[in-house]
Amino acid sequence: MKNPVLIHKHLIIRAEANRVPTDEEQLQHWMREFIDSIDMKILMGPYVKYCKMEGNRGITGIAVIETSHIAIHVWDEPNPALMQIDVYSCAEFDPYVIADKIKNDFDVVKLDYKYLNRETGLKPIRLKK
């Protein structure tokens, strides 16, 4: 039976940014604040780890939220840095609020996204603004 309250929204963001988190504590703090700012509840994490491998150097953070997960990957070797952000939730969220926060917090110079309804497939959602 279908749950009328349950939804499946997935926001995938690729951003190039000038000011990104470069240490574990900094990203962990940002993720907590970010999750709170979009009215989500953390169940586990955020778990954050810095990878020092040349060519793949950067930081990854993952949090389990009450309605699914949030992940962020930052490669800090390129200039501007590359960020990949994944927000999946079974509750409503505003993709504009998320995009604006990322743009402002990280001095984003380029941002691309896909917003999907995954309830019965991988259907793109057209944003109106």
What are these model-derived regions, one by one?
Residues 1-129:
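Polybasic/polar functional segments that serve as interface/processing modules
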